[in-house]
Design a protein with these regions (language model features):
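Intrinsically disordered, low-complexity segments of exported/surface proteins
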Residues: 1-250
Length: 250
């Protein structure tokens, strides 16, 4: 069901004309297996690539979940996409009020234009952990994406250091998305790449996080993505909910 406080329109017709590079898509390579208690579907749009020289296969997995913006009592969503090409893994994480499971653009009209959110916690918040097969991540780049997932040109992207935190990693929460952007169906996206060693544990965990820039509780309230094998279809767990996954292999 749609949030009564949000207006909707077709995502195909609502694509922004103000964006930079666009990620290539190949929907024909996607398959979706939903086990979500809230009937969230996930999808994988990143085209897979076979690296002939290394005889490696690129694997794309997408994990989604939903929370509640407790300041306005409306749904908010996260989407985490991983692309593993055998030598590195790229993580792309988006927080948005536009439900990724639908073909319409949900516009949270209740939001104040000046209201703003982060997609990460403080420096004390562990965002993700990595198994022994991974190298050390160095930087994360944050930017605003439109409802198709394309990066918009304004505001400009910002790159910050990834820091060790506890048993995992985090990045600074200075980049934000405001209500005016959210009401266009936009999302707050951060991406980072981690090298993969030849052997070892390739599991990882991810802790989705979002809150108002003025502080408060995590809108995703303890949800966690746990993946043991990122080269095959995996299931994320979020409390009693189970987010669906999609895998594209070539």
């Amino acid at each position: 069901s749609k949030d009564s406080a949000a207006s909707t329109e077709s995502k195909d017709s609502a694509a922004s004309t103000d964006f930079g590079s666009t990620v290539a898509t190949n929907d024909s390579n996607s398959s979706s297996n939903s086990t979500s208690a809230i009937n969230l579907r996930t999808f994988s749009r990143l085209a897979t690539t076979t690296f002939a020289a290394a005889a490696a296969t690129s694997t794309t997995n997408t994990y989604t979940g939903a929370g509640t913006d407790t300041n306005y009592n409306i749904p908010i969503y996260y989407k985490l996409t991983t692309v593993n090409n055998g030598t590195s893994m790229t993580f792309t994480y988006t927080v948005t009020y536009d439900n990724p499971a639908t073909t319409t653009v949900e516009r949270p009209t209740a939001l104040s234009n000046s209201y703003a959110i982060y997609n990460t916690g403080t420096t004390n918040q562990t965002m993700f952990t990595l198994g022994s097969a991974y190298g050390t991540p160095s930087t994360a780049t944050s930017y605003i994406t439109d409802s198709t997932g394309a990066q918009v040109s304004n505001p400009r992207a910002n790159t910050t250091n990834i820091n060790k935190q506890g048993s995992g990693y985090t990045w600074a929460n200075g980049y934000q998305m405001n209500g005016a952007q959210a009401k266009q169906g936009y999302g707050l996206t951060t991406t980072w790449t981690v090298p993969i060693n030849s052997s070892g544990d390739t599991s990882f965990t991810f802790n989705p996080y979002s809150t108002s820039v003025t502080g408060g509780t995590n809108f995703f309230n303890g949800q966690k993505v746990t993946v043991t094998d990122p080269t095959s279809a995996s299931t994320s767990t979020a409390n009693s909910q189970s987010a669906s996954t999609s895998t594209a292999n070539s």
